Amino acid sequence: MKIGGFQKTSLLDYPECISAIIWTMGCNFRCPFCYNKQIVLGDAEEMPEKEILSFLEKRKGLLEGLVITGGEPLLQEDITAFAEKVKKLGYPVKIDTNGTYPEKLKELIDKKLVDYVAMDVKAPKNKYNQLTGAKTDIFKIEKSIEVIKADAPDYEFRTTFVPGLLKKEDIVEIAKWLDGAKRFYLQQFKNNSPLMSSKLDNVAPYSKEYLNETLNEIKPFFKNCYVRGV
């Protein structure tokens, strides 16, 4: 596993769980609003996998889970083997994904190696390439959504609401696409760290009022629907 970041404790990233977080290096997207630029480009200092596993071993009974984020964790060839090691230590695993590897995601779910999946739905279908900075196979995105809704033990979908790239109508389109999903988060755009595209560095986030107005329009499509990051 190419691990480029590690946080020993988080109360926010795994719902109702005190977790540690690792960031895997590399991503097949170049989302202009991404704030993990070093991780995505593989420029972060790599951490030994055994160091993470040793920490988890020592923190048994104190930590309640591990979040594997990135980058795109499912790019890692040994993600399955790593998840197996973490599960053997007794930890629930949350994986963040962009949805471009539905087969690998299903394998992890079928092998009971993931307990919570968070998938970023970047845009409505017609804007996906623009929001990801890459040519995207929408079939794979759709397949991942299908797998998560049908098979994931627990899950959330989420969209970062980027001013100038997405507006309320786009979020409504995403909500229609995900209709019936258990949980959705509308995430506030943040530019307090270097972004993939410097063009967004001085873009102001949408107001709390506009986020809540958008939230009220999409609530009927989800069992649970929230704003995050305001």
Language-model segments: residues:
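Glycine-rich, highly charged phosphate/nucleotide-binding loops
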Residues: 45-55
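N-terminal [4Fe-4S]-dependent radical SAM core
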Residues: 1-23, 30-41, 54, 58-62, ...
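Conserved functional loop/turn residues at catalytic and ligand-binding sites
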Residues: 26, 35-38, 90, 113
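Conserved Rossmann-like nucleotide-binding pocket used by diverse enzymes
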Residues: 23, 69, 185
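Glycine-rich phosphate-binding "P-loop"
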Residues: 38-44, 65-68, 72
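Conserved AdoMet/S-adenosylmethionine-binding subsite of the radical SAM
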Residues: 53-65, 74-214
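A C-terminal junction/extension of Radical SAM enzymes
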Residues: 210-230
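Flexible loop residues that form catalytic
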Residues: 39, 71, 122, 189, ...
